[in-house]
Amino acid sequence: MQENFILKNGKRVLIRDIVPDDYDAMQTYWQALATETIFTNQYVGRKPRSKESFDKQCDNPYLWGVGVFDGDKIVGACQCFVFHPEHLWCGYTAQFGIHMLEAVQSMGLGRHLMTLMENWCVSQGMERIEGSVRTQNHKAISLYLKCGYEIEGLSKRKALIDGVWHDEYRIAKLLNNVRA
């Protein structure tokens, strides 16, 4: 998958599949993301994922992942994976994560990435997409609600950040895609 996308400010970025050669760029991206926000699971000083683990993830047929590139620099990403792909009863649920640097937030990119991700889920026969979002992340919550996601529950004390507990909403969208 590869396509150009024009942000609301007129800047052009490239959205494409993450591949094993993107390992170093992803490590740089994770570090930059960790300095900008507490709304992801990235934090300053986190040990980098191994190259072997990254390569394995890139080759997983049950995982969809794209990066948003500004030149050679990754400025955003979206991933989605089938939670239990081989399970007869539960193989219709996908989990997602989306994140981007502040410079490209509120530029129409999030909604577009969500649409691409949902299209992949439909092509995989998914019925449900789910994720979590920190309750203070108002931009993301607004995006998810606009995209048709619902808040299904609250996970209390999900993350302890700088001595403060943070709750997370559990969110989901039903795709009505299952073949009966």
Say what each PLM segment does:
Residues 12-26:
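A short beta-loop-alpha structural element at the N-terminal edge
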Residues 11-13, 72-77, 166:
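Glycine-rich phosphate/pyrophosphate-binding loop shared by adenosine-nucleotide-utilizing enzymes
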Residues 106-119, 123, 142-146:
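Conserved acetyl-CoA-binding loop-helix of GNAT-fold acetyltransferases
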Residues 114, 137-140, 157-162:
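Short glycine/proline-centered loop/turn elements that form peptide/ligand docking sites
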